[in-house]
Structure formats: structure tokens, C-alpha cells
């Protein structure tokens, strides 16, 4: 079973690598991708938070925002409702798909025990996984990814070629 996690500095393109890889794999007829993707929420050039999207259903919510009432992490408030309703459910439901995508295993997501439990269910399965791993997280779940996954570091020199390389690895392994 192929399990790849990409890591690297903030803003280097980890989520973009995973998104481009998932898009390429989704072109394969009958190939189902499930899981989550996060993206920046920007206003007037400033990052105000992050959205979270269920890759299978397209359902979108707010993961975190500068304005909010959830647990605070840096300048953001984590929206536990959307993280659990959309994020944790998307990860659990992805067990019925051909590939589980998790963007990201990072401090915001790891605040939710429901999300952590959903990811642990995936790790206990035999499903192929493609994940974004926060570069410095010391959470026990992040450590499991570092030990059990092939970890690729994204940088400006390889970020354009990685989606194709990762796609080809999954296609060879999954037939």
C-alpha cells in the first residue's frame, strides 16, 4: 500500500502539489478520491483564515478565521463545527474511495479529537493515502505519519515536478 506525505516550509506549495496530484488521479476513469483539502481565505491580499472542502461531495466550510469563537491558534480561531462536520466526516467517508487525501495533518486539524480519530481509522486501514504533513508538528499522529509514510519535502526546486512523479507512483501501484 502506497502512503505518501509531503512536507516543507509554509507557503512552499505542499497543498498545491497534493491538489494537482489528486486532479491528475481523478482523470482516471472510475478512480474515486475522498478526503479533505484546505485553502487560504484572503481579503485584500491578507490571509484571514482557511477553508476546508470535502473532495468527494464538494461541501465547503471554514476551518479557521481571524474572526471567530473557537479555540485560538496563533491569530486564528479554529471552527471545530466545520472541522468535525466536514473534515472528520470526509476523512471517514474516504475509506470507501480508492485514495484518501488529507490536507493537512497540522496544528489546526489536530485540535479536534474527532478529526484525529478519523485519521487514525484511515491509518488502521489498508487504503492508499496522500497527505500534507505540517513541517514541525510533534503531535503523536504527525509522528505516526513520519514513521509510516514515505515523506517527501517540497521546495521551490521540485514543487513543479512532484505532482507528476507522485501521480505516476500511485498509478503504477494501483494499476
Swiss-Prot record:
Residues annotated as binding ATP: 8-15, 99-106
EC category: hydrolase
Transmembrane regions listed in the UniProt entry: none
CDD domains: RecA-like_Thep1
Record EC number: 3.6.1.15
GO molecular function ontology, one term from the record: ATP binding
Reaction it catalyzes: a ribonucleoside 5'-triphosphate + H2O = a ribonucleoside 5'-diphosphate + phosphate + H(+)
UniProt keyword terms in alphabetical order: ATP-binding, Hydrolase, Nucleotide-binding
SUPFAM superfamilies in the cross-refs: P-loop containing nucleoside triphosphate hydrolases
Classification via InterPro entries: Nuc-triphosphatase_THEP1 (IPR004948), P-loop_NTPase (IPR027417)
HAMAP family the UniProt entry points to: NTPase_1
UniProt-listed PANTHER family: CANCER-RELATED NUCLEOSIDE-TRIPHOSPHATASE (PTHR43146:SF1)
Family, as annotated: Belongs to the THEP1 NTPase family.
NCBIfam families in alphabetical order: PRK13695.1 (NF010248)
Role: Has nucleotide phosphatase activity towards ATP, GTP, CTP, TTP and UTP. May hydrolyze nucleoside diphosphates with lower efficiency.
Name of the protein in its database record: Nucleoside-triphosphatase THEP1
Lineage: Archaea, Methanobacteriati, Methanobacteriota, Stenosarchaea group, Methanomicrobia
Amino acid at each position: 500500500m502506497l502512503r505518501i506525505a509531503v512536507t516543507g516550509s509554509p507557503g512552499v506549495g505542499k497543498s498545491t502539489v497534493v491538489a494537482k496530484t489528486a486532479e491528475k488521479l481523478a482523470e482516471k476513469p472510475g478512480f474515486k478520491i475522498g478526503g479533505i483539502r484546505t485553502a487560504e481565505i484572503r481579503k485584500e491580499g491578507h490571509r484571514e483564515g482557511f477553508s476546508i472542502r470535502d473532495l468527494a461531495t464538494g461541501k465547503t466550510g471554514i476551518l479557521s478565521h481571524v474572526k471567530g469563537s473557537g479555540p485560538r491558534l496563533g491569530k486564528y480561531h479554529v471552527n471545530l463545527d466545520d472541522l468535525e462536520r466536514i473534515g472528520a466526516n470526509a476523512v471517514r467517508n474516504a475509506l470507501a474511495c480508492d485514495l484518501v487525501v488529507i490536507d493537512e495533518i497540522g496544528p489546526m486539524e489536530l485540535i479536534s479529537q474527532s478529526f484525529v480519530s478519523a485519521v487514525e481509522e484511515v491509518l488502521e486501514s489498508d487504503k492508499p493515502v496522500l497527505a500534507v504533513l505540517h513541517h514541525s508538528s510533534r503531535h503523536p499522529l504527525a509522528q505516526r505519519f513520519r514513521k509510516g509514510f514515505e515523506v517527501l519535502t517540497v521546495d521551490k526546486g521540485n514543487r513543479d515536478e512532484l505532482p507528476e512523479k507522485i501521480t505516476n507512483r500511485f498509478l503504477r501501484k494501483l494499476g
